[in-house]
Amino acid sequence: MAKGKDKSGRLSVFKGHEARLNKAIFHTLALKGPQPVYALLKEIGKQRGFADTRYGVVRRRVEALEKQDYLMRVGVVKTHVGSYTPVYQLTPRAELALALSKTNLDSFIKKADYAQIIKMLETLKPC
């Protein structure tokens, strides 16, 4: 087997140093719906391994995911201090990434009938 980068089926958003936090943000927004960064931090902080996560880290990750078109701003909400903060939600790209990360493609290929396989091929064919 040749050396080099692993050609696994993992998506780039779920690879690397920030992968765990990306997954936590995606799952929280998928379960709780659109939220500002502070509410995201409160929910993520309840998860195992994220108790000491800081606001600035989550905010920077959310802004990076917004630039990559995985999150989008859907409004603003007034904070207790009186300022306004954006509310974020998942884009269809992020929802697809979550669905693909939960799908085992090997088992899909083995269990799918020809109609499902043909439909998947048509979807994945480049234009």
Regions found by a protein language model. Name each.
Residues 66-77:
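A short, conserved structural fragment
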Residues 35-45:
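Short acidic, hydrophobic short linear motifs in intrinsically disordered regions
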Residues 18, 76-100:
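Short, cationic-aromatic polyanion-contact patches
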Residues 45-59:
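Short, positively charged loop/turn segments that connect secondary-structure elements
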Residues 59-66:
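Short, hydrophobic-biased segments on the C-terminal half of alpha helices
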